[in-house]
Amino acid sequence: MILIYDINTEDNDGKRRLVKIMKTSRKYLSHVQKSVFEGDITEGQISLLKKEIMAIVNMKKDFVIIYSLRDGVKLNREILTDTPDPTDNFL
């Protein structure tokens, strides 16, 4: 799955939400780039992640997208630059 978020940080509450969302996402997924996370997690973990995120976000100010792939569907991941892959250190 891929998780992407844009948290409104115009006020201190937004800045706190941003940190909480990042920490929550890191519990389940690999941090790929600023507000982008990816990983292969179970349906149960997806449910927990969604529940935790929904408890943090401001529904009127923040934006969160989750891309999920159904079982058996393979996602081709291609890095187009020469920079190191930030997920290389994960097992």
Curated annotation (Swiss-Prot):
Any GO molecular function: RNA endonuclease activity
Keywords: Antiviral defense, Endonuclease, Hydrolase, Magnesium, Metal-binding, Nuclease
Coiled coil segments of this chain: none
Positions contributing to Mg(2+) binding: 6
Pfam entry (one): CRISPR_Cas2
Enzyme class: hydrolase
Swiss-Prot/TrEMBL cofactor(s): Mg(2+)
Any single GO BP term: maintenance of CRISPR repeat elements
SUPFAM superfamilies: TTP0101/SSO1404-like (SSF143430)
EC number: 3.1.-.-
InterPro entries: CRISPR_associated_Cas2, Virulence_VapD/CRISPR_Cas2
Subunit organization: Homodimer, forms a heterotetramer with a Cas1 homodimer.
Similarity-based family: Belongs to the CRISPR-associated endoribonuclease Cas2 protein family.
Biological role: CRISPR (clustered regularly interspaced short palindromic repeat), is an adaptive immune system that provides protection against mobile genetic elements (viruses, transposable elements and conjugative plasmids). CRISPR clusters contain sequences complementary to antecedent mobile elements and target invading nucleic acids. CRISPR clusters are transcribed and processed into CRISPR RNA (crRNA). Functions as a ssRNA-specific endoribonuclease. Involved in the integration of spacer DNA into the CRISPR cassette.
Name of the protein in question: CRISPR-associated endoribonuclease Cas2 2
Native species: Moorella thermoacetica (strain ATCC 39073 / JCM 9320)
Lineage, opening ranks: Bacteria, Bacillati, Bacillota, Clostridia, Moorellales
